[in-house]
Design a protein with these regions (language model features):
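Multi-bladed beta-propeller domains
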Residues: 3-23, 27-28, 35-68, 95-112, ...
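Beta-strand-rich domains and repeat architectures in extracellular enzymes and scaffolds
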Residues: 57-92
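Residue-level detector of Asp-centered blade-edge/turn motifs that repeat once per structural unit
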Residues: 76-77, 120-121, 167-168, 212-213, ...
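Hydrophobic beta-strand positions that form the internal "hydrophobic ladder"
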Residues: 81, 122-126, 169-172, 214-218, ...
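Short, solvent-exposed loop/turn segments at conserved positions within beta-propeller repeat blades
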Residues: 86-91, 132-137, 177-183, 224-230, ...
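Cap/lid segment of the alpha/beta-hydrolase catalytic domain
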Residues: 396-519, 526-527, 554, 559-569
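Active-site-proximal cap/loop segments of hydrolase catalytic domains
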Residues: 475-666
Length: 666
């Protein structure tokens, strides 16, 4: 069992002395009460003297524990949690005891450090670091006290991710796009840096995890002729042929995120072959011989969860009796556990909001996870063995922000043009935020992806707009996750078709319900949401008074030519081959219809964006100059696909607010 080192970097909870920041984690006042949702209403309500003006820096600049790039990791002895936090203004690796009495900062630099993973002996931490938001993550290791930092990979043109320690702690498995094409599976020796390539970089491999004896890796990959399907594969860690587990038995769908049971006899995974994402088990008994070689048999598949709600992210209890997993119910996500023998299923953590990255301690009862609500950013929480309720380890929200002055979004559904119900979150501003306008203006906040989902978690953009007196509709249009496979695939081959209809139907619903005034609605979104913002302004110009797009796609043809290889495959999977579907690529691009954009448009872009290059935005800027459309354009240096620096996030939202104030409130 690992012991705390004699020396540590500075104790972050003690040393953090910036003015008016949140109290240390051990003194958080009644967090369970503060995050309870308020009464649902589709009209502005008053909170009286509790309302106060919030500075944009306190809201948009609020730190949060990273939930995009690897999340958290619980140490093998269950005593400490490693995580990436931007409390200093940049994502750095931190460690905190599960008792919550200390927080230690381990890295300190200008580059983003994410994806921390403990070595099996608890003495080392591996993590990823990129430069300027370029997502070309390199693998680093350091001692558990933050010392002896060492870079293991140096292929600066490639990105590395999904790192996993071997059981003996001598190697790390990962995927990289070192060939410049798709992501393939590799192993690096921690001591020497020697690399072993396990796959051919033709299939976009992901999520490698070691068998308990270190002889095999399980990973997910798309190796069907139809790249819309995914399955689990085994490959010898010494190199060799990959074996498909055939968890789908020839049906359409995806099986991903495989996790070995502690005894190595089963693999828990997420699959949507029955329409909803659920947790299943692949029983490997009889599949491998005594020497560990394949016998040519398929595993026995058992469905472990059986729910109308999507279930994902399985994690084994160390005693092997069951798994914890995440279950999404509309806009909320809870942690649950299910036992292998009985299939008995019960909640573990069900705070209002969204839970992610659940990890089980060696006692099989302690559970660490990330949690965020509409009124609090992503923080590390722990439910200790025999504890009734979980407790926070970190506290990210500034003490200057009263959670009660933030809006609790309402989960609504509205009909689209074809009759399909579209789920959405509605942020209704408090009466005190209005400007004597009667019916307030509205902003439709379109998420990226489109594989993604608006959840009842920390959304400082929607909160800020609501605080400024805007109604915000955050729709989960067709193509979103969280509502089953059919809904998720409903816009495949039709981006800018019926999904655009879902966006426009949301505006009609706001107007018909008297929630927002006509011709006082703006569109806002990033990435795919940025594409949809620009495309909506071009194809439905009568609906919109203004738009703001950040890191948005303007031409699917040129994006296919300039983006990363794995994203090119994603485009082909969702839109078709760029030659065979050339007309679709052309017609569904905002650039094609740029002359039809009449509403004022603000375009924001990261200079280092590896997904949607700056050249995308500049094509539309040139077209708008020719058509004399009112627009503005700003590029952020040292930023990628989204804005990681606090000053840039603040500037982005300040520009967007001024844009909407000027054009929706004129």
């Amino acid at each position: 069992m690992s012991q705390p080192p004699a020396t540590r970097p500075r104790n972050f909870a003690d040393d953090w002395s910036a003015a008016a920041t949140a109290s240390p984690p051990t003194t958080v006042a009644n967090p369970l009460v503060e995050i309870q949702p308020g009464p649902h209403s589709l009209r502005p309500t008053s909170i009286g003297p509790r309302f106060h003006e919030i500075a944009i820096e306190d809201l948009v600049g609020a730190p949060h524990v990273d939930h995009r790039w690897g999340g958290i990791d619980l140490s093998p002895d269950g005593r400490e949690i490693a995580f990436s936090w931007d409390r200093t203004g940049n994502n750095e690796v931190f460690v905190a005891p599960v008792r919550g009495d200390r927080i230690y900062q381990l890295t300190d630099g200008s580059d983003r450090s994410v994806w921390p993973r403990w070595s099996p002996d608890g003495q080392w931490i591996a993590y990823l670091r990129d430069t300027g938001g370029d997502e070309r993550f390199q693998i680093w290791v350091m001692r558990r006290d933050g010392r002896r930092l060492r870079q293991l990979t140096s292929a600066t043109a490639a990105g590395h991710r999904d790192i996993a320690w071997s059981p003996d702690g001598t190697r790390l498995a990962f995927v990289s796009n070192s060939t410049g094409h798709r992501y393939g599976l590799e192993i690096v020796e921690v001591a020497s840096g020697a690399r072993l390539v396990l796959s051919d970089f033709e299939h976009d491999d992901a999520q490698p995890r070691w068998s308990p004896d270190g002889r095999w890796l399980v990973f997910s990959s798309r190796r069907d002729a139809a790249r819309t399907n995914a399955d689990l594969f085994l490959i010898p860690s010494a190199g060799g042929e990959a074996i498909c587990l055939d968890t789908r038995a020839g049906t359409e769908g995806e099986s991903v995120d495989g996790h070995w049971s502690p005894d190595g006899r089963m693999i828990a995974f997420t699959t949507n072959v029955r329409g909803r994402s659920e947790i299943s088990l692949a029983h490997l008994d009889g599949m491998l011989d005594e020497a560990g070689g394949p016998r040519g048999r398929s595993p026995r598949i058992v469905v472990l969860t059986n729910s109308i709600y999507d279930s994902t992210e399985p994690a084994w209890r160390p005693d092997g009796r069951g798994v914890v997993y995440l279950q999404a119910r509309e806009s909320q996500v809870a942690v649950r556990r299910v036992f292998v023998a009985s299939h008995a299923d019960s909640p573990v953590a069900d705070l209002p909001g969204v839970h992610k990255f659940a990890h089980v301690g060696p006692d099989s009862e302690t559970v660490a996870f990330l949690h965020a609500s509409a009124r609090r950013p992503h923080d590390v929480w722990v439910r200790l063995q025999r504890a009734v309720v979980p407790q926070p380890i970190t506290s990210s929200l500034s003490a200057r922000v009263d959670p009660g002055t933030l809006v609790q979004p309402v989960h609504v559904r509205y009909p689209s043009a074809d009759g399909r119900e579209i789920p959405a979150l509605l942020y209704v501003p408090f009466a005190e935020a209005l400007r004597g306008e009667g019916t307030p203006p509205a902003i439709v906040h379109i998420h990226g992806g489109p594989l993604g989902q608006h959840l009842a978690w920390w959304d400082p953009i929607s909160q800020w707009f609501a605080h400024r007196g805007y109604v915000v509709l955050a729709p989960n249009i067709r193509g979103s996750t969280g509502y089953g496979r059919e809904f998720q695939e409903a816009n495949r081959g039709d981006w800018g078709g019926e999904d655009l209809g879902d966006v426009v139907a949301g505006v009609r619903w706001l107007e018909q319900e008297g929630i927002a005034g006509p011709r006082r609605v703006g569109a806002f979104g990033g990435s795919y949401g940025g594409f949809m913002t620009m495309y909506a302004l071009a194809r439905e110009p009568a609906v919109w008074a203004a738009g703001v797009s950040y890191v948005g796609v303007v031409s699917w043809k040129t994006l296919h030519q300039t983006t990363r290889g794995d994203l090119r495959e994603y485009l082909e999977r969702e839109l078709g081959d760029p030659v065979g579907a050339a007309e679709l690529y052309r017609d569904r691009s905002p650039l094609t219809h740029a002359r039809s954009i009449t509403a004022p448009l603000l375009i924001l872009q990261g200079a280092n964006d590896p997904r949607v290059p700056q050249s995308e935005a500049e094509q539309l800027v040139a077209a708008l100059r020719e058509s004399k459309t009112t627009f503005d354009y700003h590029v952020y240096p040292d930023e990628g696909h989204g804005f990681r620096k606090v000053e840039h996030r603040v500037d982005m939202l300040r520009r967007a607010t001024e844009w909407f104030d000027r054009h929706l409130r004129a």
